[in-house]
Amino acid sequence: MDKGSAATPPAGPGASGTTPYEAIKAIPVRHYGRWISAVVVAVLLGWLVYAFSQGKIIWATVGDKLFDPSVLSGLGNTVIISVSSMALGLVLGILFAVMRLSKNPVTSFVSWLYIWFFRGTPVYVQLLVWFNLSLIFQYINLGPIYKNETVDVLTPFMVALLGLGLNEGAYMAEIVRSGIQSVDEGQSEASHALGMTGMQTMRRVVLPQAMRVIIPPTGNEFINMLKTSSLVSAVQYPELLRASSNIGTTAGAIMEMLFVASIWYLTLTSIFSVGQYYLERRYARGSLRTLPPTPFERLKANLNMFRRTEVAK
């Protein structure tokens, strides 16, 4: 056999003079369940829209009162009391979490008692207790330092701040405690070996690492605080729900103003949910190799998949 014949490839499928390979035709998977569920959801939404459109609701009033000065003032007060109460709750949460983990049995017991009491009683009851505290103590007397009537000290804002902030502090204490305990004890031991004090170790080593565990539930707590703040309308604080209810009672548009309040609550929670999402991504950078896609990245990926499906057809 000569070299020419040895170098010639054997005849077979796809060679010259034979039937060429056929291109593979990819058939996309049909997700019939998704289409069925989408139709069911669309029908239910259509039914709800139709039901509300036929009800005795003046939708023009909703649009007219959406930016009413009283409503916007109540909206601002809602944000102020929510941020203030959350800040107080966060400070108290860190303090009582550290006390709870202390080796001192007295401070640990005091922290446990605080958490047990404020988590075990409804926040609405706590607000009413603060609001009616003047029935028990007519004066707040600190001796030569300060003395004043309780009614003058416990304004609606102070009542709302104490009621929401102290209650939130109990929940934040458990969240912070779980975050601190998630950090390996070797980190603290190494810090002590380097000569750091307990407070320096907590501030520079433990808490920064614990933030990955603390941030997600803290964001949820703040969003919940925005909605829980509606309870302070019972103690005369002029927040969003109270402002809307006052207008609704005066104008005879109670349901319309409840819809106005709901729209603003949804707007606030949506805005802060986006902020929470990106804050979680920031603190997840050191723990995840690949960060979860953002909503815009998911939308882009879905559009690309849809285009590839159309091309395949």
Regions found by a protein language model. Name each.
Residues 1-313:
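Transmembrane alpha-helices and adjacent helix-loop boundaries
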